[in-house]
A protein has these predicted regions:
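Aromatic/basic-lined ligand-recognition segments
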Residues: 1-3, 70-75, 126-203, 213
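Glycine-rich, often proline-containing surface loops adjacent to acidic residues and nearby aromatics
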Residues: 10-17, 82-98, 126-135, 204-219
Length: 257
């Protein structure tokens, strides 16, 4: 079933992360001996749909000390999204305002297929983790509303401190910063799902930011053929949690009602 479309969606970024095993060297260093060739071959395969390559500053860090660090970006247009990023042991697919599930799913499946097609020695490509991450944010004036009151009223999350902690105290009731996180085991797909809420800023305005992350490692499907099933199952959970959390006033606000 396609995901609901929100006119004013709170999405900051949707990210797919694919990690693969690196070769250990002296000390704690890890390298992908095929990275340079992989990058060139991915360039050839991505250029049609992502014609704007962008070398990141960390590209100049030696590969021996830059494991799992993205170094090259491929954009659909200048300063535009979506994009794909590559580094030793890592590939990501990222989207922001233009995100739709159908498009993101298609791009993610295609990117994983291209990774396997481009990897110089595909038999040695050992995928170690798959991660689907959603970052959302909603503007909140925390000078007028306590963060746990907002969480309780708008997102159905009960978390608070007893009022008597602040009785006859010089400690202010409004927290300077708030961070809450929980991680749960997941059976389908096999892995864990985490939910994190923090106070921060979006576009210069005080906001509540939350991340919903489905991460699988170890027991992974056969790739690349099994990837579509994995991302569908991961999205089914993250999407279900998102809409259950915002049900009510926030969903109406994000829908533009």
């Amino acid at each position: 079933m396609p995901s609901k479309q929100l006119k004013n969606k709170p999405l900051v970024e949707a990210i797919l992360e694919v990690h693969w095993a690196l070769q250990k060297q002296a000390g704690d260093m890890q390298v992908d001996p095929h990275y340079k060739l992989l990058l060139g071959r991915m360039f050839d395969r991505l250029l049609g749909e992502y014609p704007v390559p962008e070398e990141l500053p960390q590209a100049f860090i030696p590969d021996q000390i830059s494991a799992y660090m993205v170094k090259q970006r491929f954009r659909v247009g200048a300063n535009d999204w979506p994009l794909i990023q590559i580094g030793p042991g890592i590939m990501t697919v990222n989207d922001t305002a233009k995100y739709t599930w159908t498009d993101f799913r298609s791009r993610s499946i295609a990117a994983v297929g291209k990774l396997f097609d481009a990897y110089p020695k595909v038999g040695s490509l050992n995928i170690t983790s798959l991660i689907l991450r959603y970052i959302d944010a909603v503007e909140v004036d925390f000078t007028k509303l306590r963060v746990w009151d907002f969480l309780q009223d708008k997102l159905k999350l009960s978390t608070s401190l007893p009022d008597n902690l602040f009785a006859d105290s010089t400690v202010q009731r409004m927290p300077r910063h708030f961070h809450w996180e929980a991680v749960f085991d997941c059976a389908k797909p096999s892995g864990v799902i985490s939910l994190r809420f923090v106070t921060g800023e979006k576009e210069g305005k005080r906001s509540l930011i939350w991340e919903t992350v489905l991460s699988s490692e170890g027991e992974l499907p056969s790739l690349p053929d099994g990837f579509a099933g994995w991302i569908d199952a991961a999205h089914a959970i993250t999407d279900d949690w998102f809409f259950k959390l915002i049900e009510g006033e926030l969903e109406r606000r994000f829908s533009g009602e």
